[in-house]
């Protein structure tokens, strides 16, 4: 859904999320949560630390927006606050990284801070236009999550483990079917694909 999302702002069509990724983490049973779907405590990865993928300078911080209820339509979400609590890091001229939907009150940086790869920016949450805890990440050509166009990016390396064949079943709490395929294995200098199950540096799925 990200790749085709377009925004008409100030008379200009923009595609800010063309290469965006929503990261979720499955538990050892390959489930998204364990417990009630609407309880944030059921999601073991809720509150996981979010690290900066690059060096750069913090140019935008939003915090204080409430958490949404998982499994339900977002309440009070607008185009202006769709990214929820978030941090934007200027990588270099014309390249900015967005880390969105952070946990309320969790941002660890301020505008003007210089960061290195691995710096903790905040904690994973469910704020803004979100119906389950996740990290929304993309690279864009300006500091605004709205008034920008997406830029392609790649990961240094990741381990492909297959694909989730039924995303709706995963989100609803059912056991997903992980389908191994020819893309399983080590990948370098590539971007992950839709519904692909990957691990980074032995961190798990």
What do these predicted ranges mean?
Residues 2, 11, 51, 77-81, ...:
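Acidic, glycine-rich catalytic/binding loops that coordinate metals and/or anionic ligands
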Residues 44-45, 55-103:
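Zn2+-dependent peptidoglycan hydrolase active-site motif and core
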Residues 25, 60, 101-104, 126, ...:
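A residue-level detector for short acidic-glycine micro-motifs
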């Amino acid at each position: 859904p990200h790749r085709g999302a377009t925004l008409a702002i100030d008379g200009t069509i923009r595609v800010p999320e063309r290469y965006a990724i929503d990261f979720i983490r499955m538990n050892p049973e390959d489930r998204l949560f364990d417990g009630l779907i609407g309880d944030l405590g059921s999601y073991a990865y809720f509150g996981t630390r979010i690290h900066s993928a690059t060096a750069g300078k913090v140019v935008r911080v939003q915090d204080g927006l409430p958490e949404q209820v998982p499994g339900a339509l977002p309440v009070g979400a607008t185009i202006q606050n769709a990214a929820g609590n978030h941090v934007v890091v200027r990588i270099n001229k014309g390249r900015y990284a967005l880390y969105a939907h952070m946990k309320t009150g969790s941002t660890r940086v301020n505008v003007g801070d210089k960061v290195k790869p691995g710096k903790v920016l905040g904690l994973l949450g469910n704020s803004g236009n979100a119906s389950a805890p996740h990290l929304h990440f993309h690279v864009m050509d300006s500091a605004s999550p709205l008034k920008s166009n997406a830029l392609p990016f790649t990961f240094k390396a990741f381990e492909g483990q297959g694909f989730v064949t039924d995303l709706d079943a995963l989100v609803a709490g059912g056991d997903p079917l992980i389908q191994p395929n020819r893309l399983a294995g080590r990948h370098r200098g590539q971007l992950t694909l839709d519904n692909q199950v990957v691990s980074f540096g032995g961190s798990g799925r």
